Amino acid sequence: MTIHAAVIQKLLNTGAHLGRRAAEHHFKQYAYGTRNGMTIIDSDKTLICLRSAAHFVANLAHMRGNIFFVNTNPLFDEIIELTSRRIQGDSYNHNRAMNLWKMGGFLTNSYSPKKFRSRHKKLCFGPTTMPDCVVVFDSERKSSVILEASKLQIPVVAIVDPNVPLEFFEKITYPVPARDSVKFVYLFCNVITKCFVAEQMKLGIKEGSNEDLMKDLAA
């Protein structure tokens, strides 16, 4: 089995190719076909888009940029928290990274979060400094964040489902077409982490080796 075939098989094992509904017209470029009213996503297209997103993340690490993760699905909390800890290290803030996004102004209000937190202690009102990239999970529900990031010209990396509306899809800089299963989100976060941390090691920002990184991610 070739490396490409092995990677595609790994994607198939995550269920990334199983779209939940019929695809919107703009998504059909990523669709292999349909079955029982559900879109079958082309795994080759998913892999191409995942590589593009990973390359961007590596360049971001080289420029010493920062990433902010946006998630509302509790099934992904543990995965994304672990990813955030590995990428952000000592600067990781559990409350900022893991709390739910429930109202507008996530990015545009990022410079004045304190006046809200006294009344809404369980909410997350965004980073205290502008991120260089926003990674969005459950992009259909996080359309307001995508619009804000686009307005502020912040690149967006997002896992996209076949029914994401065109107005939001067009504003995602690096769309990764896939079903957001727990297995795929874990794979996606692993790829992001490997690329970002490996580049940090090259720059001497993080100590360790690629071998250490691989062992850590496999644990």
Swiss-Prot record:
This protein's UniProt keywords: Mitochondrion, Ribonucleoprotein, Ribosomal protein
Keyword Mitochondrion on entry: yes
Principal place of residence: mitochondrion
Subcellular location: Mitochondrion
SS bond list: none
MF terms in GO: structural constituent of ribosome
Lineage: superkingdom: Eukaryota
GO cellular component: mitochondrial small ribosomal subunit
One of the protein's GO biological processes: translation
SUPFAM superfamilies reported for this sequence: Ribosomal protein S2
Gene3D superfamilies per the UniProt record, alphabetical: Glucose-6-phosphate isomerase like protein, domain 1
Similarity-based family: Belongs to the universal ribosomal protein uS2 family.
PANTHER family: 30S RIBOSOMAL PROTEIN S2 PROKARYOTIC AND ORGANELLAR (PTHR12534), SMALL RIBOSOMAL SUBUNIT PROTEIN US2M (PTHR12534:SF1)
Subunit structure comment from the entry: Component of the mitochondrial ribosome small subunit.
Protein name per its UniProtKB record: Small ribosomal subunit protein uS2m
Gene name in the database record: RPS2
